[in-house]
């Protein structure tokens, strides 16, 4: 029984699904998808639970959410192993994900008060008040690269605001989704407040097509995000938050410490086996001898990165990709770039057949025409050389995406110029592209999102504002508008 609907674990009535460790092939989870009827059942449960959950005080809802944080802490080792085994991440990285989930609770509570709390302004004859109300029933679509942390970034603020939820994890990480749901169950969420439906495309389509849905919060690929946007077009009453990918540029200008710059680049491009939406996909490198030396060092250090299993000792920097198919897609993308005229500096290699262990790849594309503006979701870095900083900014902005952008340079003036001209929601200076502050919004423009950034701003799309003018008494104004006569004379 792998679906959680209205406070009960039930068996899915859809297609059967098996999840294996992407490196070893070990069977980790087996179950059945939710069919359309069960998706509707989850929606009815969420709708029925909404009035009571929304009427609770924030303090009462916060008690449950903080209890969940405590359960994350006490079950950290177990959840770390589940995420690592299911995604292929090394143990150390899965542990950082669980830590981020724990920290998200306090951050979301603070953000609720700052972004969507209550305000009151006194007026001569009363007061003006601002409150925020929950939307109702929200669907949360989770991704596979952070199967705990990223859905958590939607679920926690949505619950705090008083919404009820139908959560569909990625079909590639059903075990992690179920494990997190069981902790919410232990935290004491009332039946129907949070429901879990497992499944792939068919389940997702049934969920997004629900008429009684008040909103959908999505993290994933741009193509799917565009499909959801089209599906919900003409329904302005539904909130839609899309956090999608990026074809992210990292500009390496002047470098004082080559090894430090190489380390930053590897952290930007290859952490999580290149499976972060903010990962550097395009390296824009200044022409000249220093750029040549940097590139040679980057290739040399990257060549030493050997991906390993989640529990290998010593621990590897990167593990496997989410699946053998995902790893093969990266290899295919590299082969296509090479066929277009790209110059391979480091060829990506599958270490074993029927595994997702893939070494990083680096390919130079300077002067190659018609390079696709697509996100290759894996450890493949494309390199372009530039002559002037103005040219670098033009190259950085030459994408339909707009998630993250970074600059390595000792010159503050160049960063200030980039801040003015870059088209990206995250613009970093001498910091990895994959780094983001917990007290900042997270999202992009263009094909990277629909102007609904998450993280610190997630509270914004989890509630709607209600403005009020209030007075505890009613009296006739001392001065009336022209044409109003409240005298005692009888009009004949």
Curated annotation (Swiss-Prot):
Reaction catalysis annotation: N-succinyl-L-glutamate 5-semialdehyde + NAD(+) + H2O = N-succinyl-L-glutamate + NADH + 2 H(+)
Residue positions of the active site: 243, 277
A Pfam family hit: Aldedh
Cited InterPro entries: Ald_DH/histidinol_DH (IPR016161), Ald_DH_C (IPR016163), Ald_DH_CS_CYS (IPR016160), Ald_DH_CS_GLU (IPR029510), Ald_DH_N (IPR016162), Aldehyde_DH_dom (IPR015590), SuccinylGlu_semiald_DH_AstD (IPR017649)
Chain residues that bind NAD(+): 220-225
GO BP annotation list: arginine catabolic process to glutamate; arginine catabolic process to succinate
EC number, UniProt record: 1.2.1.71
GO molecular function, one term: succinylglutamate-semialdehyde dehydrogenase activity
UniProt enzyme class: oxidoreductase
Keywords on record: Arginine metabolism, NAD, Oxidoreductase
Pathway: Amino-acid degradation; L-arginine degradation via AST pathway; L-glutamate and succinate from L-arginine: step 4/5
Function: Catalyzes the NAD-dependent reduction of succinylglutamate semialdehyde into succinylglutamate.
HAMAP family per UniProt: Aldedh_AstD
Family, per entry: Belongs to the aldehyde dehydrogenase family. AstD subfamily.
Protein name: N-succinylglutamate 5-semialdehyde dehydrogenase
Phylogenetic classification of the source organism: Bacteria, Pseudomonadati, Pseudomonadota, Gammaproteobacteria, Enterobacterales
């Amino acid at each position: 029984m792998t679906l959680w609907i209205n406070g009960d674990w039930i068996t899915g009535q859809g297609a059967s699904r098996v999840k294996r460790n992407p490196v070893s092939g070990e069977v980790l989870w087996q179950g059945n998808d939710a069919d359309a009827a069960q998706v509707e059942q989850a929606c009815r449960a969420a709708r029925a639970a909404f009035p009571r959950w929304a009427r609770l005080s924030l303090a009462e809802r916060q008690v449950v959410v903080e209890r969940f944080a405590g359960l994350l802490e006490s079950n950290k080792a177990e959840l770390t192993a589940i995420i690592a085994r299911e995604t292929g991440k090394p143990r150390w990285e899965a542990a950082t994900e669980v830590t981020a989930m724990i920290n998200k609770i306090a951050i979301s509570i603070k953000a609720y008060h700052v972004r969507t709390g209550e305000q009151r302004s006194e007026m001569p004859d009363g007061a003006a008040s601002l409150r925020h109300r929950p939307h109702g029933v929200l669907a949360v679509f989770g991704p596979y690269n952070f199967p705990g942390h990223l859905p958590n970034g939607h679920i926690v603020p949505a619950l705090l605001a008083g919404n009820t939820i139908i959560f569909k994890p990625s079909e590639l990480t059903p075990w992690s989704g179920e494990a997190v749901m069981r902790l919410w169950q232990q935290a004491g969420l009332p039946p129907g407040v949070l429901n879990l439906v497992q499944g792939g495309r068919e389940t997702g389509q049934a969920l997004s097509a629900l008429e009684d849905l008040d909103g959908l919060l999505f993290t994933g690929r741009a193509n799917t995000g565009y499909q959801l946007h089209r599906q919900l077009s003409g329904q302005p009453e539904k909130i839609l938050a899309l956090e999608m990918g990026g074809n992210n540029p990292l500009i390496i200008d002047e470098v004082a410490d080559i090894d430090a710059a190489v380390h930053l680049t590897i952290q930007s491009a290859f952490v999580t086996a290149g499976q972060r939406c903010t990962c550097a996909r395009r390296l824009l490198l200044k022409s000249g001898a220093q750029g040549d030396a940097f590139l040679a060092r980057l290739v040399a250090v990257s060549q030493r990165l050997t991906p390993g299993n989640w529990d290998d000792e010593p621990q590897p920097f990167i593990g496997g990709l989410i699946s053998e198919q995902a790893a093969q897609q990266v290899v295919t993308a590299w082969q296509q770039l090479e066929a277009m005229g790209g110059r391979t500096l480091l060829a990506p290699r599958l270490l074993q057949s029927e595994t997702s262990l893939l070494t990083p790849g680096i390919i130079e594309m300077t002067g190659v025409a018609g390079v696709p503006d697509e996100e290759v979701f894996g450890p493949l870095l494309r390199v372009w050389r530039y002559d002037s900083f103005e040219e670098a900014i033009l190259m950085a902005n030459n994408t339909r995406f707009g998630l993250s952008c970074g600059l390595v340079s000792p010159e503050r003036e160049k960063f200030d110029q980039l801040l003015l001209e870059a088209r990206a929601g995250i613009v970093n200076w001498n910091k990895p592209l994959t780094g983001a502050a917990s007290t900042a919004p997270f999202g992009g423009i263009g094909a990277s999102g629909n102007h609904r950034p998450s993280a610190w701003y997630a509270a914004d799309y989890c509630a709607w504002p209600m403005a009020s003018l209030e007075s505890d008494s009613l009296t006739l104004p001392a001065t009336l508008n022209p044409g109003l006569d409240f005298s005692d004379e009888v009009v004949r």
